[in-house]
């Protein structure tokens, strides 16, 4: 796949997640997708992760600010905004690297890791 096709896959994935459409995972990730940052293995783990994010932040949105593609990897810088049920607002920047093979994401890494104590403070 071309670099532009790989970027288009990441763009489609982001657009679907912004709509809370988790069905896109079946189309654009492999069944054994690995999220190295959050130690997720498989589409079901990723689905559970985003289900929690969407529950904790009913208003959640990612904007792509930068894209770089090289070989089978796409680097993307996101501006993430959200509002917790408490009304507390968040805004942070993350950088993700996704490896794309045959039109599907097979693994990814994200910085910063937004889990644990830091995640709880956001709520």
Where are these regions (language model features)?
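C-terminal and inter-domain tail/linker signature
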Residues: 1-123
